[in-house]
Amino acid sequence: MLSCISIFYWDQEYNVLDYEEKVVDGFYDVYGLSNDPAMQGKMPSLADLEANPGGSSFEVVIVNRTIDPALEELVQIAQCISLDCPVTEIGIFVQRLAELVTSHMGGPVKDANIILARWTERSTQLRTSLHTSVLPLGSLDIGLSRHRALLFKVSIMACQYLKPCGPYII
């Protein structure tokens, strides 16, 4: 079954999610497949993507805390950060979440080419060890901007019931 939010994300010209859109378990981001003429306009199912070996030219990052203990641990840390920050200090909360994501995803990016090279190497290792191009978000210890943004969104959404943020609920 295709995740509705995954389909919405796939259909967007720039693969953008708004702040109101929740990323829930089952969401997956397909990268590098939209250039395939056979796939134009059609989002492949997760089962089809998982059937492809790790040597495929595309990448899929899945959000699923039930099968991704590293992601579940990161979400729990994010929730602890949320509970530890005063409601009036939302900036501190956001900064700490950003630091959590940065730390988990390979540190600050000083040179995009270096992080891309590190990501390419790590991605190849993960695909080989997992025998698939579908990578659990929590398993990514090096991340490009799309991976970091997704982890930040998942982390902040996990804290939404814990902390009000002005007119928004984080």
Per-region residue spans from a language model:
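Acidic/polar, low-complexity linker and loop regions
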Residues: 114-123, 151
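Hydrophobic/aromatic-rich core segments of domains that either
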Residues: 143-170
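A short linear-motif detector with a strong N-terminal bias
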Residues: 80-81, 122-123, 161-163
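Charge-rich, low-complexity amphipathic helices
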Residues: 119, 123-128, 156
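N-terminal accessory/pre-domain segments preceding catalytic cores
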Residues: 1-117, 128-140
